[in-house]
Every structure is written in structure tokens, then in C-alpha cells.
């Protein structure tokens, strides 16, 4: 792929390269890692509307690829196409196109709107071929082996394509861009109840979900949060940590498995535009449910599920209320190539595990569901042979390719229009300490609360931060004054001690004076607090040593 030198951001529309913070903040925040180190040492469209456009002045508009001059996709353009001429099932998605129904090793050629063949794939054992990366020069390669060139080529851009197969040419199909969304009725007609189920994406792929309500469905609606990742958020009866805590505090929770993971269909890849678009679709479909309070949802999650929130929010789902990402990165490429040196440590291991778990039956619980008769889960495993080995793929990208701008969070977070609560530790042993590069990229007119601290990867769920997290979700998702009941505190002490080794609990109910109904007053007091808060010397408390919680807090505007 056409590569740019590491760190060259001028051609991405960032004048003078990447900047982090206003000068007034920069001098003090730059010193924080040194001080901490010493302490440790001692909107949705409709079928007729035009495609959703980026706002004027959007710095990433040219990297959110859409088919030029085309209206929003019609219902007929969405989902699988049973093509009469070729006899194939052709599924155009967001910067992807999947073909099924061919014979093993049969040649499946993709041609552009000019009638030129741009890539030929040999179908896998199941008669499948998946187009996502296109070489500069037409080639014929075996599908599903991840051996497409990674230096000379590009992604599959949105637009009109056709498939050639067996001497026949298919009808036109439309590959979508992230911002080319389905109509409101597509989301409104989907129904989800308490428990396990599936939600349908704009390309017809189904993602597995697990809904957990805090009470009977008829007693709703409930404030609702979504946790979206490639781990096991939709595994029945085993919620991820963010969902578990939110459920304890009275929220309805929905765990959603990314495409190509768990029981979800589709081809897995790491943070690609299709995955971002799926997040939009999932948010809109979930928010349309009758049991969702205000028909808006928030998002929660740490690490993988935290990073995913930033990508999803950048697609601007109209019914997303707020996000609370924790322990995040600023760019997948730089995570794999920090300082231009290949990361053979955690990132390599993490990508290898993602590849393994995205294999058919790779998470064990999906196999259990198939054995119990879940035919949708079983059918969704068939396409897994087309999954890309992203570890090998990314290792070949020694230089930053321009097409990777679609995953560069420093370019995407300016598009986020919802309130954001973001936390991270400078010594994060897994995702690293680059997350502050995101801070000044957020829209200054949108509410944000950033908390930085010295500490480890899971500390976002520690007592030091979890009460702040709950306060944010209460104000911006639930629309309620935060108030943690005594019963919840009594039940939580042992959980915190088990996970953090220290006898701690939730913080005080800071807005109790505003109960029961002075919501506006409580929220005004919360909003008036500093947007950037640095928690200094966490773990240095002598009662006992290691207790999470700062000795000093530095506030920045």
C-alpha cells in the first residue's frame, strides 16, 4: 500500500503534525509521567435521504470513504443478493464484498464500475470468497489464506462493483461506506428481549447479543448501556466487567460480539470500517427497543470494549447518549509499531489470540450453543475461513499506509458528538500511555471528563474511579441523580477486595443534597468540575500501601 513515513501527518490534514494539548496544559502534563514514575520508584438517514455527510470543517471527512454522488442505500441495496446470472450469493458490506455458493477453488473475479477485473480469488473449501483488500495490479490468489500483498494495494472502496463467475457477470452491487446507513425502519423493526439473541447489520450479517434487564421487561424502560467487543460480551450469564457493574447499579446491559467472533457472523478484522459501522447499527437497533429509557443508550467497557466505543461514537449514531471508554489506545498501527519498532510483546500476543478466538468455535461457548441447537450460531461459523491473520498483516506494514487513517483514532475522535468519560493509566502494561494524544482532538463544545493516573490496565474499575464512572453514566445516560444504595455497598466490598486485594468500596454519594428531584442542580455541579483531572501518587497511601486512590489531584481546564 502507498506508505507514508512514520509520524508524517501533514497529508492527513493535521497542520504541523500531531499536537496533544493546549500550551498551558502541555508544560504541566508533560511532567506527569516523570512525577508518577518517581513515586513508583520510591444521525440515522432514511431510504430517500442523501447519505449522512460529515459536518463542515470535519478534519477526517476525506478519510470516511463514501461512494461519491450516491444517495443513501435503498432497502434493495442492503443485505445478500441472490444473483440470477452467476448463481452466487453476493453480500456487499462496508468496504467489503463476500461471495458464497461457488465451488471449491473456482475463480471468482471482482470488477469495478468500468468493467475492469481488479482481483480474482479462488474460492475456499466452502465455496466462499471475501474481498476487502485490492492489489494495485490484478492478481489471482487463494482466498482465506491472508496472502494478499500488503505493500502495493488499498482497501475496497465504496462504489459499484460486479462479480464474474463461470463466464457470467452479475448485476451491479453497491459496496458501502461507513456513513452510508440504513433507514430508520431497518432498526425499528428489530426486536430484542431479555436474554440471548441476534441483531442484524445493514449488510445482513447477524451479531450475537445478550440482554440483561434489571427487572421484568414490563417494568421498564430502563437506562441501558452496551458493551461491544471481540471477547465474549454476548456469552449468556457471564457479563463482562463493565456490564456486570452497570447491571449491579440498575442499568439494563447489552453485550454485543463483533462480527466474526462468538456466535456473530461475518469476517473478523481489527477495528476496520465494517466493525465501526456494525457498532452504529447495533446502537440504533438496541436504542429502538421499548425497554430502553429515552430510546438512547450509553456504552461501557475497558480496553478492547473501551477502544471500540471511540470507533463507534465516531460514526455518530443518533441514539447514542454517551460513552465511557477506559484504558484505550490512540492508533492500532502505532500500537504495533511504537517508535517504528515492532511490538513483539503484548500487542503481538493479543493479535495472535484474536486470530485464534475468531476461528470457527474459537471461544468454546459458541460451540456449546451450536451443540444445543443454535443454528444461526452454527451457520455464522462457516465464513471464518476468510478471517485475516491481522498480526501477520500488520507486521508487514512497516510504514503507516494512508488507508489506515480510517482506524487512526486521533483523526476519528473529532467526529464524536456525545459526552465522553475517558480514563487511563500512564503505566498501562497492555495498551500503553499514548491515550492523552486524543484529548485535544475531541470537540471542545462537547462535554468530556478525562482522568489520568499512575496505575495498571484494569484500574478503571477500581474504587478510585468507579464512582466517578457511575456518576457520569447516571447524569448522561440514566438522566438521574447518582445515588448508590447501602445494600449495593455492602455487597460490593468483597468484590473489590477479591479483584484489587484491598478492602475498599464505592465513594460517597456526593450529590445527596440534591435528592430526590434537583437533577438540574446536581448536574450543573457535576459539569462545573474540571474536565481534565490527574490523580497523583495512587497506591502511595500508607493505609495500607497499594490502596488505589490519589494523594493529590491536579485539575486542568
Task: Mark where each language-model region is.
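Cap/lid segment of the alpha/beta-hydrolase catalytic domain
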Residues: 192, 197, 216-288
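N-terminal cap/lid segment of alpha/beta-hydrolase-fold proteins
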Residues: 177-220
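Alpha/beta-hydrolase fold nucleophile elbow
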Residues: 291-303
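Alpha/beta-hydrolase-fold serine-hydrolase catalytic core, especially in secreted/extracellular enzymes
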Residues: 60, 116-117, 123-126, 135-138, ...
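C-terminal motif of bacterial Sec signal peptides marking the signal peptidase cleavage site
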Residues: 38-42
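Accessory cap/linker subdomain of secreted extracellular hydrolases
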Residues: 237-240, 248, 311-416, 483-557
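Extracellular ectodomain segments of secreted/surface proteins
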Residues: 58-103, 117, 122
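Bacterial signal peptide processing site
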Residues: 44-47
Amino acid at each position: 500500500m502507498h506508505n507514508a513515513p512514520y509520524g508524517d501527518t501533514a497529508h492527513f490534514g493535521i497542520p504541523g503534525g500531531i499536537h496533544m494539548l493546549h500550551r498551558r496544559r502541555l508544560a504541566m502534563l508533560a511532567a506527569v509521567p516523570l512525577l508518577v514514575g518517581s513515586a513508583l520508584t520510591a444521525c440515522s438517514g432514511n431510504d430517500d435521504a442523501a447519505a449522512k455527510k460529515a459536518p463542515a470543517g470535519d478534519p477526517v471527512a476525506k478519510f470516511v470513504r463514501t461512494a461519491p454522488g450516491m444517495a443513501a442505500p435503498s432497502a434493495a441495496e442492503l443485505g445478500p443478493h441472490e444473483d440470477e446470472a452467476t448463481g452466487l450469493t453476493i453480500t456487499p458490506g462496508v468496504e467489503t464484498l463476500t461471495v458464497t455458493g461457488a465451488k471449491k477453488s473456482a475463480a471468482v473475479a471482482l470488477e469495478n464500475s468500468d468493467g475492469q477485473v481488479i482481483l480474482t480469488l479462488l474460492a475456499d473449501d466452502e465455496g466462499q470468497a471475501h474481498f476487502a483488500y485490492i492489489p494495485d495490479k490484478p492478481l489471482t490468489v487463494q482466498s482465506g489464506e491472508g496472502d494478499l500483498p500488503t505493500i502495493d494495494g488499498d482497501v475496497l472502496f465504496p462504489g459499484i462493483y460486479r462479480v464474474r463467475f463461470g463466464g457470467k457477470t452479475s448485476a451491479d452491487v453497491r459496496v458501502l461506506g461507513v456513513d452510508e446507513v440504513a433507514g430508520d425502519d431497518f432498526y425499528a423493526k428489530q426486536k430484542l428481549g431479555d436474554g440471548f439473541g441476534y441483531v442484524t447489520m445493514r449488510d445482513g450479517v447477524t451479531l450475537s447479543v445478550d440482554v440483561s434487564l434489571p427487572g421484568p421487561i414490563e417494568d421498564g424502560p430502563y437506562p441501558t448501556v452496551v458493551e461491544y467487543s471481540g471477547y465474549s460480551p454476548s456469552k449468556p450469564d457471564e457479563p463482562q466487567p463493565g456490564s456486570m457493574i452497570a447491571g449491579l447499579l440498575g442499568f439494563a446491559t447489552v453485550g454485543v460480539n463483533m462480527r466474526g467472533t462468538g456466535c456473530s457472523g461475518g469476517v473478523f478484522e481489527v477495528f476496520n470500517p465494517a466493525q465501526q459501522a456494525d457498532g452504529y447499527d447495533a446502537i440504533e437497533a438496541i436504542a429502538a427497543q421499548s425497554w430502553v429509557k429515552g430510546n438512547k443508550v450509553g456504552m461501557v467497557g475497558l480496553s478492547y470494549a473501551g477502544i471500540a466505543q471511540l470507533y463507534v461514537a465516531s460514526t455518530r449514531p443518533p441514539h447514542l447518549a454517551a460513552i465511557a471508554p477506559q484504558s484505550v489506545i490512540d492508533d492500532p498501527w502505532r500500537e504495533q509499531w511504537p517508535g517504528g519498532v515492532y511490538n513483539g510483546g503484548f500487542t503481538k500476543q493479543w493479535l495472535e489470540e484474536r486470530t485464534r478466538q475468531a476461528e470457527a468455535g474459537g471461544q468454546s461457548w459458541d460451540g456449546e450453543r451450536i451443540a444445543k441447537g443454535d443454528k444461526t450460531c452454527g451457520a455464522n461459523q462457516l465464513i471464518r475461513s476468510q478471517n485475516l491473520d491481522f498480526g501477520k498483516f500488520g507486521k508487514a506494514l512497516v510504514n503507516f499506509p494512508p488507508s489506515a487513517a480510517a482506524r487512526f483514532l486521533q483523526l476519528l475522535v473529532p467526529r464524536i458528538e456525545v459526552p465522553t468519560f475517558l480514563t487511563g493509566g500512564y503505566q498501562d502494561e497492555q495498551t500503553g500511555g499514548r491515550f492523552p494524544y486524543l484529548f485535544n482532538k475531541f470537540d471542545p463544545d462537547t462535554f468530556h471528563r478525562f482522568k489520568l493516573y499512575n496505575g495498571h490496565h484494569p484500574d478503571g474499575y477500581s474504587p478510585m474511579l468507579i464512582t466517578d464512572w457511575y456518576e457520569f453514566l447516571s447524569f448522561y445516560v440514566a438522566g438521574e441523580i447518582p445515588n448508590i444504595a447501602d445494600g449495593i455497598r455492602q455487597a460490593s466490598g468483597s468484590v473489590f477486595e477479591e479483584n484489587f486485594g484491598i478492602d475498599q468500596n464505592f465513594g460517597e454519594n456526593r450529590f445527596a443534597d440534591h435528592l430526590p428531584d434537583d437533577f438540574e442542580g446536581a448536574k450543573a455541579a457535576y459539569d462545573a468540575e474540571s474536565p481534565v483531572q490527574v490523580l497523583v501518587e495512587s497506591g502511595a497511601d500508607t493505609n495500607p500501601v497499594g490502596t488505589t486512590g490519589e494523594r493529590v489531584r491536579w485539575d486542568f481546564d
